[in-house]
Amino acid sequence: MSDSCPVAHDGNTASTSESENPAIPSPTPTGNRPRTNRDWWPNQPDLSVLHAHSSKSNPMGADFDYAQEFAKLDVEALKRDVIALMTASQDWWPADYGHYGGLFVRMSWHAAGTYRIADGRGGGGQGAQRFAPLNSWPDNASLDKARRLLWPVKQKYGKQVSWADLLVFAGNCALESMGFTTFGFGFGREDIWEPEEIYWGPEDTWLGDERYSGDRELSGPLGAVQMGLIYVNPEGPNGQPDPVAAARDIRETFARMAMNDVETAALIAGGHTFGKTHGAGPADLVGPEPEGAPVEQQGLGWKSAFGTGVGKDAITSGLEVVWTPTPTKWDNTFLEILYGYDWELTKSPAGAWQWIPKDGAGAGTIPDPFDSSAGRTPTMLTTDLSLRLDPTYEKITRRWLDHPEEFAEEFAKAWYKLLHRDMGPVTRYLGPWVPEPQLWQDPVPSADDQLIGDADIAILKSRLLDSGLSVSQLVSTAWASAASFRSTDMRGGANGARIRLEPQKNWEVNEPATLSAVLQTLERVQQEFNQAGGAKVSLADLIVLGGTAAVEQAAKNAGQDITVSFTPGRTDATQEQTDVDSFEVLEPRADGFRNYLKGGEKIPAEILLVDRAYMLSLTPPEVTVLVGGLRALNANFGKTGHGVFTDRPETLTNDFFVNLLDMGTEWKPSKTEENVYDGVDRATGDPKYTATAVDLVFGSNSQLRALSEVYASEDAKQKFAEDFAAAWTKVMDLDRFDVN
């Protein structure tokens, strides 16, 4: 067998794409514009994302506890029902080879595979595949049928299992029903009830690729090569059938989902061990996607006018590929066939580029999905050949030819990671099949020591305030530790005290030199307390407690007596428990709460403030009170005076709002400092304050100004302190899944 490159580089492709999507026209946005405030004033911060997933859209009620309901679930019975579904073929969408396994593997993969590591968005953790745009992406064609097949199971178990869990559990069950041993599974995903507003790219047509610049540089944080795809175009970049060029796209997009080369190769080879793609006829005979389909189709899309439209006549992608002779069984035949032939280009019945063995080799060795008397020729996608023709992937996959047990192990681990990457630490996982924590789950030690009680907390607060650290230092350090959290994939946060480890201790926003000195003092307090015997305090708890004590002291300085809630139980992670590369993506490009903006950032700071607030699960009132309070506490990056509109810093006052709304101050862009504004006395012109756009937006944006007016009022001093304390505690506890 020759290893020469079998690629034709001069072909043109039809407008088909990913392994399961039809080449149908994109939906055209219509409407009478301008029709919203955003249309009139597109540069205003969009605060609507901070109102998303309101309880008003959730039918389950405020008291619904998914974990409690799940505890009532017979998971073994659920598993039996899902596995039974695999071979219960339905006439309205017949199962290929009498088994829906390949379809459900694809459904689960595409539910989880939208995850992107750059901002943690996407993934299967909320059941978003049920809603637009994901339910109508060309890459998700025919997955509406998979979800409808699952409906009787969901209907039977009701609120005891979420759609989010079921959509990914089905793929796990599919693998096991086809003889594969999975690595494990964790439930615990809670459903959303409205679409997620996520930036999926700049294009306004399906399969557009305006996201590239220069030498095929993919814009961040996007994780797919074209609009409406999960990863890559299986025909090759922009439909050009070049496996080597496709490998570059594969490597980039899978890396943006936190997968390395071994994991990537395992997922592609493992996933394509099962099932088939569908391109029995011309793609222009396929109707509109679910969101564009007529009401009588009841949310089902892509209705085909080719033959019966289903079974042997099904069109989903325009590609007609069956990879192995055993498409409902786990084995090593995908790799055996990939390396067993030399390959040449051909086209599917729909006109899509795909590959067959040269010189008619292998003809009749692949079974037909609906006619047991017929045989087919082996077929591959351009992106399958990438696993052989890319030198790195070739080294990995060729070894698996002789070591199938290694392939199975790597696929099991990669599949588990794919399904769970956006779920956060294992403390969020439910069910009996959760394996030991993996490094990518950011593990922390269990809390085995006796926890500090109220008396210990009082002693530690006193020692922290007497340690020589200022209110500002204690607040800033606690905020830096906790505010690394992002709600999109439940990573970061104060638990683990990773602020003292690589890479966080060297992030610019954390002011490494100052941070190091503060941590040394906190470690001294910790050591002195722990050496006394009895309860032990972790550095993670002490960092948060320092901020808590400082907030209480600052409120006292303002004449307000408040108690800031504190719950011990955090533990300290080690450097060995911390994947440095994985944590690098958590470094903030901006943190408006600390008035930090990374050099060279092009997106306005006030827009990035909203994104940071979204990551911290904050509402507009919480954002407002936190910014105002942190300015009063002098918690700015670099201790700049921007936005510190007070002559009594480190005192928890509402001075930020009072002075921001004072019409005696006139604001002008600074002539000496970028992204800074000078506030001068309107009557005399004397300088009064400096500010950033993050500060001034609380006076310029009408919604934020309305909130600022509440806190600037004469009767708001106590409310301001109490609201700040509540919002502060919320941020400190965002990653306390053990108690929340």
Swiss-Prot record:
Site keyed Transition state stabilizer: positions: R106
Family: Belongs to the peroxidase family. Peroxidase/catalase subfamily.
Pfam family of the protein (one): peroxidase
Modifications after synthesis and translation: Formation of the three residue Trp-Tyr-Met cross-link is important for the catalase, but not the peroxidase activity of the enzyme.
Cofactor: heme b
Identification of the protein by name: Catalase-peroxidase
Catalytic activity: H2O2 + AH2 = A + 2 H2O; 2 H2O2 = O2 + 2 H2O
NCBIfam families, per database record: cat_per_HPI, PRK15061.1
Cross-link (Tryptophyl-tyrosyl-methioninium (Trp-Tyr) (with M-257)): W109-Y231
Entry GO terms, CC: cytosol
Function recorded in the entry: Bifunctional enzyme with both catalase and broad-spectrum peroxidase activity.
EC number, UniProt record: 1.11.1.21
GO MF assignments: catalase activity; heme binding; metal ion binding
Record: residues binding heme b: H272
